[in-house]
Amino acid sequence: MKKLAYFLTAMMLVGCSREFVESIYDINYEPTNRFAKNLAQLPGQFEKDTMALDALINSFSGNIEKRWGSREIKVAGKSNYVKYIDNYLSRSEVDFQKGTIIVETVSPTDPKLHLKNAIITTLLTPDDPAHVDLFSSKSIKLEGRPFLYQQVVDQDNKPIQWSWRANQFADYLIANKLKVKDVDFKKAYYVEIPLVENQVEIRGYKYADIVRRASRKYDIPEDLIYAIIKTESSFNPYAVSWANAYGLMQVVPKTAGRDVFKLVKKRSGEPSPEYLFNPENNIDAGTAYFYILKNRYLKDVEHPLTLEYTMISAYNGGTGGVLNTFNRYDRKRAMRDINSLQPNQVFWALTNKHPKAEARRYLEKVTNYKKDFNSGKT
């Protein structure tokens, strides 16, 4: 998975515009972002990483461009799943925010057969990110309960768990929903499949036991954990981001992950991407980082609601960003200022004056999702 970090870096360095990065990853690309902070902490690492850029671009984005053209490069993100198969001729994209699946192929021979295989693969992809390589065209071993089980229904309004039903639905889609478009001087055959209306809730319910255990273990409210997961990944365990963050709670190995290992797990090193793609590990690590924020970095915040607001903001933009909102030069003065204000005043400052636009939006999103959770919505 080191290739992922190199690839996303490469995309930003070799032609992807600021607007492209912002639109794909929903961030405001500022010098203070988490990715830049990671590089600053590892001054020799960036130079080392860039040595592999050309090879990685040729092996991944180069293969995509060769098949699909430069305007049709799609990669997995925080709230979308993208998987290539069939030597990059076929792919699927699940957009969890839009609630749609697009499965398509540019195979020059037997395109309907290739499309059918891609549809079946998409519908039966297992609910285990460890078995799916998002950054190659390797095939997927279709076993176990599908990741999209109950999030998609067939023409008879039935969930799809078994091969025979996936085959039947694929035939139906190709016979009734097939579309064709031009892609880089070739034809792309595709179908669009809607996710069910409550797809977010279905994914969220899968992690209820894990969230409950993490909440009790670290004394962090369940509604806050759910709100963070929904904000970070839309309950997508395959989530990856430009900031080298992984999984449901988008844990960055070199920062939050390293802190959790050192301060909570009492072990050296940092979690691997494979470790963080495991939902239980990821939720445990993300919640443990909230424990660190609460009991170490922000332990001097006095009001419980103010503490929650500052924790949420710090999870996205760092403790330094929170303190800089109130005083850029004196951290002790910043803490005194925070404690002199009412929680609603702190909330206003963090959503209007925080140095990072992404962090300003983040606090609003999380608090809104918390309200949804407590009103019966996931």
Task: Give the location of each predicted region.
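Short, functionally critical alpha-helical segments immediately adjacent to catalytic or ligand/cofactor-binding
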Residues: 219-240, 251-252, 286-287, 311-316, ...
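Secretory-pathway/luminal and periplasmic proteins that interact with or process carbohydrate-rich
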Residues: 233-242, 258, 317-329
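Sec-dependent signal peptide recognition
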Residues: 2-9
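Catalytic and binding regions of secreted/periplasmic enzymes and modules that target cell-wall glycans
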Residues: 282-331
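Cell-wall glycan-active module
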Residues: 15-230, 295, 300-301, 328-378
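Substrate-binding/active-site groove segments that recognize
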Residues: 242-269, 284-292, 340-341, 366
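Short helix-coil transition/hinge motifs at the ends and kinks of transmembrane helices
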Residues: 261-272, 299-304, 333, 337-338
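Active-site metal-coordination segments of metallo-dependent hydrolases
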Residues: 199-202, 273-283, 357-358
